[in-house]
Regions:
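Beta-rich, blade/repeat-based domains predominating
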Residues: 29-44, 72-91, 113-128, 156-174, ...
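A short beta-strand motif characteristic of beta-propeller blades
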Residues: 24-28, 65-71, 105-111, 151-158, ...
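Hydrophobic alpha-helical segments and helix pairs
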Residues: 103-158
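Short loop/turn segments immediately following beta-strands, especially the blade-tip
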Residues: 188-195, 295-300
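Blade-level signature of beta-propeller repeat domains, shared across WD40, Kelch, NHL, RCC1
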Residues: 260-307
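A short helix->beta-strand "capping" segment at the edge of beta-propeller domains
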Residues: 3-31, 60-62, 200-201, 293-296, ...
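Conserved beta-strand positions in repeat-built beta-propeller and related beta-rich domains
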Residues: 41-42, 47-53, 82, 87-93, ...
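A short loop-to-beta-strand structural motif that recurs across blades of beta-propeller domains
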Residues: 56-58, 94, 143-145, 184-186, ...
């Protein structure tokens, strides 16, 4: 497919990390409408993330400190390194490659029947991309897809409301999944050879009054870290679904989290301002920021897309 020209990366210095009274650090006061999809990029020592409605991919380097931003077009819902070089992003109904210098993007694959737009995405241990879509009107018109190394798109789950968090167990036999309106974290049996999933069961139920599950990551102890939209927290659950820990975030709309840093013992958390009233923003002025916490455990490194 014909490449589309892009403006390239623009880099700016940002304020140094600032300690929070509740623990952790304010890493970047981004003012993002909907910061999402954080993922550690080991080769650059930076955090990748997107601001969905702004159509921007950000590369945040905590040690500089600086942020490089690239306008790829809205909405852009996830960003993942590509094993062959550059990045891949999910847009409305398309998987798109972005070259290293941010000067062009090229469509790779299309997600048929994707509902209103694509949302969260992550690679499995084999480098296959799992990407979900969503409805913006409260329906269940989304799906969860897998993109194989040959760029074939396989639909795995239908009638999805808002496809969100994905994670895999250390034995590579389970995949965890969040469809936000259901208020649950579900577990599938996962075949590492084929990438197929089956036997869906509920592991965690979130009280709707407390918030809704959004993004998710997993540590090397097979504990799940779940971002709670509307709850201002990241919750940690053991493999049986028992709540064993909580991190308070000074922004109610917590969107996602990932492990990063040299030893993958830091938890990076993204948040949003979308849909908040002026009064809410006055109470929570750091909404839309990126935060960092000492996790006390080690997380699993991300995997690049092999397609």
């Amino acid at each position: 497919m014909k490449p589309v020209e892009l403006p390239g990366w623009v880099t700016e210095a940002i304020a140094p990390p600032r300690p929070l009274d509740t623990g952790g650090e304010l890493l970047w006061e981004a003012g993002a409408t909907l910061a999402e999809g954080p993922l550690w990029e080991e080769k650059t020592g930076s955090l990748l993330l997107v601001d969905i409605p702004a159509g921007k991919v950000h590369r945040l380097q905590p040690d500089a400190p600086s942020v490089s931003s690239l306008e790829v077009g809205a909405p852009v819902s996830s960003v993942i390194p590509r094993a062959a070089g550059g990045l891949v992003v999910t847009m409305i109904d398309t998987l798109v490659s972005v070259d290293d210098d941010g000067k062009s993007r090229t469509d790779l694959a299309r997600f048929e029947g994707a509902g209103d737009r694509m949302n969260d995405a992550k690679c499995d241990p084999k480098g296959r991309l799992y990407a979900g879509s969503m409805s913006t009107s409260g329906g269940f018109t989304g799906s969860l897809y897998r993109v194989d190394a040959n760029l074939e798109v396989v639909a795995l789950v239908s009638e999805v409301g808002i496809s969100n968090g994905l994670a895999w167990s250390s034995d590579r036999l389970s995949m965890y999944y969040i469809d936000t309106p259901l208020g649950t974290v579900d577990r599938f049996s996962y075949d590492p050879g084929t990438g197929d999933i089956s036997d869906r069961t509920v592991v965690v139920r979130i009280d709707p009054g407390f918030g809704a599950p959004d993004g998710m990551c997993v540590d090397t102890e097979d504990h799940l870290w779940v971002a709670i939209w509307g709850g201002g927290v990241v919750l940690r659950y053991d493999p049986a679904g028992v709540l064993v820990g909580e991190l308070e975030v000074p922004a109610p709309r917590v969107t996602s989290c990932c492990f990063g840093g040299d030893d993958y013992d830091e938890l990076y958390v993204t948040t949003a301002r979308e849909g908040m009233s002026d009064g809410e923003l006055d109470r929570f002025p750091l909404s839309g920021s990126v935060f960092r916490f000492s996790a006390g455990v080690v997380g699993t490194p991300p995997v690049a897309f092999v397609g």
